[in-house]
Amino acid sequence: MEMMIKKFCQRYRLPEKSLHELLSHMTEYHFGKGESIVKEGERNSNFYILKKGIWRAYYMIDGTESSLWFAGTGEIAFSSWGYVNNEVSQVNIESVNESIAYGIAKPDLEELFNSSIELSNFGRKIFEQIGRAHV
């Protein structure tokens, strides 16, 4: 857990106290190797922080999987289509190996953003990065 906290706080420049506040509102989930977290064509607006393991996002082209990104310990993962636009996901997100993640539903996370300037700034930075990536 300490490694995850250190990596997360370094990567996202969030004070440890604020991360602990966020984690206290999240649920711990366990996923098996190859297990789907988000399926293409389904709506999922949850926000995840990986405690352990590796996830990947991919889409299918003519029956072939094309990977978009990988996320590991201390990183975030979510369907930007589901979270940002409440649309169905254009990608699949799966657990590459046994993994543990903390998850929170969009309404609960937005409530936290409204209650903490540090968490609000964290959220703004994340979604600004996504906006730049989709331009």
In which residue ranges do the predicted regions lie?
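Cytosolic regulatory regions built on CNB/CRP/Popeye-like sensor folds
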Residues: 1-135
